[in-house]
Amino acid sequence: LYPKIDEFELLNRKTLEGYFSGPIPFTGKKLTFNSSLRYSSQDGYLYGVKEHSVHDHANFFTDNWYIEMGGTGDTVAMNPSASLNSLLKLTYKVSPRIKFSGQYLGSNGESKSYVHYYKYNPDGRSQALSNNHNTSFKINHAIGKKTFYEAHIFTNYTDYKSFQFKPLDLDSAIPFSSGDNFGSDEDLLLFIESPGQYQIGLNNITVLNDNTYILPNSKYASSQNILGAPSSPTFSFGGSNRGHTYRYSNSLGGKFDITSQINAQHEVKSGFQYRIDKLNERIFSILYDSNTYRIPTIAPENASPSHSYYSENAIFLSGYLQDKLEYQSFIMNLGIRFDSFDPQSTYIDSLLNPEAGVIKSDKKNMWSPRIGVAYPITDEGILHFSYGHFYQMPTMRNLFLTNIFGAGLSPTIGYSDLKPQKTVMYEFGMQQQLSRFIAINGSVFYKDIRDLLALQSINYNSPTYGPSSYAVYLNKDYSMVKGITLSLTKRRDPQTKTSAFIDYSYQTTEGNSVTSGSFYFNALTGEEEEKKIVPLGWDQSHVFNATVSVTEPGVNGWGLSFIGKLSTGWPYTPNIPFAGYVPLPNSDRKPFQQSLDMRLFKNFSLSNIGFELFLKVYNVLDQRNERYIFNDTGRSEYTFINRSLQETEGFKAHYGDAGVHTWDE
């Protein structure tokens, strides 16, 4: 069931880290650098078996099923990943009052996600590449003894690709005319401007649309290689995921902050930020069925559901003013923040007739008051209180996602007039030092979160296509979080060399919920799905964390740490067969979750270079947490449902055939 689950692999996860810092030679120690590099890779813990290849054929239209087994039979890692993270910072100290710095942060990653359907055809999965580059330049200037400012500009570029075989760049496609010789490069991408008959190699094909792309030499397998399907759900017998996603985002902005100690009681801070975000996303699927699309084809953008593209900009502007008041009897922080967001786009004018037209999105302006008070009750104890408003804008994908309306389609679209998520938070707590090394902390908190996003399904009567439906992201959700946290901190003392941190949290997280996972409205009948207040999917009522460390600091120091966690399971919606009623959403909980990790290290130096040897052990007790469960039992180990009853007699007749796997697998 789980290939290689009992095998121990010492090198499954590999990490290499390096840190370098110091002054640049010949600069009089005015120019310094700080750099780091980290490479990590792992095969993951889920494996498949390569029984099939992408180009295998199968036929399920006959009683005697035909199934090709073109794979090597090798065991293949199904969720591998690798990443490279880098940092370089240069700092130039012009004078004691002026300092310039520049910083680069980069990350590159590649991964494949586990897809159960492709367990026996692992080459059919997509792969993902991600790159992120962040550059910033900053100046710190102390104007006087009591005032200083920071100003910096920054850029952030993100590039994400998900594809099969190799990434495709439509801008690099070669214009094609019928009969042209295009060679045998398997990565070749051709662009055909007009519909018609075309001679492409040995194939005479019909191009149906303007601005079509074709891949005449690609390795994609036709969907007709697999004829029919077994009468019960099973695994992939060949073929691949032909979907592609390309997402590029770029941010450019600047920020200015100034701080001034006006007098002994007032420290004033103020600042503003301006940022422009750009996002474009292209999502398409390769069409190849040996009939309508006899050569792997990419349909024109935004002309069919198989190819969508959008490019949008948004502007963010924010500013704040804060005053820190320090008196002998209390400390208070008073502040107000202003945020403005301009999506610079359009959205559908009528939710009940999304094809009617679009109107311009409104600019969103938000004011956020905030206050924090600390009141000493003894020389070693403090009471504190805070209250504030916080806003979070939706992701740009939820604002701008583009799709196609049409007969029989149920597209999901973005809505650029979304409001920001609003959180109002209250917290009251106490800190008390019990001794030189031990302190306790306790607080109660409450969060009121409104305008959360929900995916609303809407049925409407299309003037073009008749009864239709679509889904759109809207501000429909609400949640409430309340709870208490208690913690105990023990600083390291020279005698025992031990430090510890223990905390316990109790909280409830409730909000709107619907059984389908999205709000539903039928414009034809006026019916809307009933809203219920239930525990949300990420709610964990009880969480206990503990960290205990024994350390000896220094160049030749050592240390041993244990990190443990115990928590209640997440909510789930039970399914009770033949019970005669439908349970409320998230009305039961998964089993407790627990973990214990360990870290051991030893420092040493060689030729004035510091080294650290360390050992990390995750899940020391080899505890198997039940994160995914059967919703009739609430456990992952068993179910009352006989899975074989879900398989037809026609399917059972092929038990034991090569390539046929049961539901239990």
At which residue positions do the language-model features occur?
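Transmembrane beta-barrel wall of Gram-negative outer-membrane proteins
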Residues: 8-110, 130-148, 369
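Hydrophobic, lipid-facing positions within transmembrane beta-strands of outer-membrane proteins
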Residues: 14-18, 84-88, 131-137, 153, ...
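Outer-membrane beta-barrel channels and translocator barrels
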Residues: 25-29, 95-97, 144-146, 263-265, ...
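Transmembrane beta-strands of outer-membrane beta-barrel pores
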Residues: 37-43, 106-110, 155-159, 274-280, ...
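Signature of Gram-negative outer-membrane beta-barrel scaffolds
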Residues: 70-77, 231-245, 253, 261, ...
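Membrane-embedded beta-barrel scaffold of Gram-negative outer-membrane proteins
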Residues: 150-154, 376, 382-388, 392-394, ...
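Gram-negative outer-membrane beta-barrel transporters
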Residues: 445-449, 459-461, 465-574
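C-terminal beta-signal and adjacent terminal beta-strands/loops
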Residues: 557, 563-579, 602-665
